[in-house]
């Protein structure tokens, strides 16, 4: 999938869009978000280690989703990583 198609889907589905760059080999330790996230790597590579599915490395053009409260960590590859992230607060019940 290309970036413009991914971003169009985020907008359609009510996500706020941000772009984030991680330096080479940077690590964002285990944490949770209060929002749902949909993320696509646009440069480099990043490994996401989720409590529910384990670790997976994502390359350019690959994407994943995290539901609010999903414990995970992120690590950039040796060339760093840039990704587009959509953030959306979960629906109130």
Model-derived features: positions:
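Short histidine-centered beta-strand/loop micro-motifs
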Residues: 9, 27-33, 49-50, 56, ...
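Conserved short histidine dyad/triad with adjacent acidic residue
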Residues: 3, 16-33, 68
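Glycine- and acidic-residue-biased ligand/ion/polar-headgroup-sensing regions
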Residues: 34-46, 51
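Short acidic-glycine-tyrosine-enriched beta hairpin
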Residues: 52-69
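A generic "binding-loop/recognition-motif" signal
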Residues: 24, 34, 54, 70-71, ...
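Transition segment at domain starts
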Residues: 1, 7-11
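Ligand-binding loop in jelly-roll beta-barrel domains
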Residues: 68-93
């Amino acid at each position: 999938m290309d970036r413009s198609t991914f971003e169009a889907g985020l907008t359609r589905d009510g996500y706020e869009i941000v772009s984030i760059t991680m330096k080479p080999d940077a690590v964002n330790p285990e944490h949770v978000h209060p929002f749902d996230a949909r993320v696509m790597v646009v440069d480099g590579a990043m490994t996401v280690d989720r409590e529910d599915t384990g670790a997976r490395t994502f390359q350019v053009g690959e994407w994943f989703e995290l539901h609010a409260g999903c414990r995970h960590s992120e690590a950039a590859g040796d060339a760093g990583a840039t990704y587009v992230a959509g953030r959306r607060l979960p629906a109130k019940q």
